[in-house]
Swiss-Prot record:
Catalytic site positions: R193, K216, H269, R272, H295, Y304 (o-(3'-phospho-dna)-tyrosine intermediate)
The protein, known as: Putative integrase
GO biological process: DNA integration; DNA recombination; establishment of integrated proviral latency; symbiont entry into host cell; viral genome integration into host DNA
GO molecular function terms noted in the UniProt entry: DNA binding; endonuclease activity; metal ion binding
Length: 333
């Protein structure tokens, strides 16, 4: 135990892991016993959690990013979200944060945002603890591991009709940014996310296909396109081996607003929904759609299954009502 008196107060001064470890100095204790108790509590908490006594939730988030988050494609974005979340939670001491603290935060948060947003926050923070546990940097259980997420109604996906698609493309063609039109065409032809189509390089378009790389889930995919679209891409796209298109998201937003479509919360992503919806309504296969969209799980793609003409069609032919009518018709023949 290393404590010393500095004037009228006491200071705890010790090393975390011997002389080679981090030096801990905490000043301002009124009594010697309080300084000694701090050192005892420090090592007790470290033994229980694997983290220093004074580590706060934001410190865990930083450790998570350094050890794992930096390897994720959206790592910096998730870091920013988790840091903001820790701040809204009051940045508690890590060893004091528990499921009850989260439940109280959730109650307050629901007055500001939708339940799905709170569920997203819970998944992000729970993933931080789970990964630190796997890495051996957190010894306690995940405080959110047993917390159930809020049940929400499935959101009906909005998509554009064929007439609306034609109207939107006319507005894109009239845009002052001449890359807006081909990028919109790519999204509608291949189901691409806007940023995937917008960031295409010249080498990614060849052989009648668009080859998407470095995408959201790191799974590359190739989707065929019409010859006319391939020629247009090379004609309008920027020269050289780099990007074909300049940034045109803002130009698309203006074109979309000129159309006056009422699709709250939808902008560029509605092109992806529109492709998938019309693909299924045209009799497309759900597994093929999964590969086209690049979904890692079929669960995400199943949102479009109900649009298939054959979806649950057997409910009519196999229903007892249908069978009774069918039987009655046989009797009267």
């Amino acid at each position: 135990m290393t404590v010393r008196k500095d004037g009228k107060t006491w200071t705890a001064d010790f090393y975390e892991n011997g002389r080679s470890g981090r030096r801990i100095r905490k000043k301002g204790f009124a009594t010697k016993s309080a300084a000694i108790r701090y050192e005892q509590d420090f090592f007790a908490v470290k033994g229980e959690t694997g983290r220093p006594l004074d580590d706060r939730l934001s410190d865990l988030v930083k450790v998570w990013y350094d050890l794992h988050g930096c390897t994720l494609k959206d790592g910096k974005q998730r870091l920013a979200r988790c840091e903001a979340l820790a701040k809204r939670l009051g940045n508690p001491l890590a060893f004091e944060f528990d499921s009850l603290a989260w439940a109280r935060y959730r109650q307050r948060r629901l007055t500001e945002v939708k339940p799905e947003t709170v569920n997203h926050e819970q998944r992000y923070l729970s993933a931080v603890f789970s990964e630190l546990i796997r890495l051996g940097s957190w010894h306690k259980e995940n405080p959110l591991g047993k917390v159930r997420q809020i049940k929400t109604d499935q959101v009906e996906l909005t998509f554009l009709s064929l007439d609306q698609v034609a109207r939107l493309l006319e507005e894109c063609k009239a845009s002052t940014n001449n890359h807006t039109y081909p990028v919109a065409l790519l999204c509608l032809a291949t189901g691409a996310r806007w940023e995937e189509a917008e960031s295409l390089t010249r080498g990614a378009v060849h052989g009648g296909k668009v080859h998407y790389h470095r995408i959201k889930n790191r799974q590359s995919r190739s989707v065929p396109i019409p010859d006319e679209l391939e020629r247009l891409i090379f004609k309008v796209g920027m020269p050289g081996s780099g990007r074909l298109f300049m940034s045109c998201r803002a130009a698309f937003r203006c074109a979309y607003q000129r159309c006056g479509f009422q699709t709250p919360g939808q902008m560029t992503h509605i092109l992806r929904h529109t492709f998938a919806s019309h693909y299924m309504m045209g009799g497309g296969d759900i597994l093929t759609l999964q590969r086209i969209l690049g979904h890692s799980s079929i669960t995400m793609t199943m949102r479009y299954a109900h649009l298939s003409p054959e979806h649950l069609a057997s409910a009519m032919s196999l229903s007892p009502l249908y069978q009774i009518k069918h039987f009655a018709s046989q009797v009267h023949q």
